[in-house]
């Protein structure tokens, strides 16, 4: 149903946000920013 679609989208967005935050953290830790 539509709720499954919404859940899927939210999961995807959450993964993307978490991934970009992790990348920023790695960048700062390695001093490459």
UniProtKB/Swiss-Prot annotation:
The keyword Metal-binding does not apply. GO terms for biological process: defense response to bacterium. Keywords: Amphibian defense peptide, Antibiotic, Antimicrobial, Disulfide bond, Secreted. It comes from the Eukaryota. Its main location: secreted. It holds the Pfam family Antimicrobial_2. The keyword Glycoprotein does not apply. It is found in: Secreted. Disulfide bonds join 27-33. InterPro entries: Antimicrobial_frog_2. Belongs to the frog skin active peptide (FSAP) family. Brevinin subfamily. This is Brevinin-2DYd.
């Amino acid at each position: 149903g539509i709720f499954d679609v919404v859940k899927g989208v939210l999961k995807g967005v959450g993964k993307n946000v978490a991934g970009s935050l992790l990348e920023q953290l790695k960048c700062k830790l390695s001093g490459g920013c």
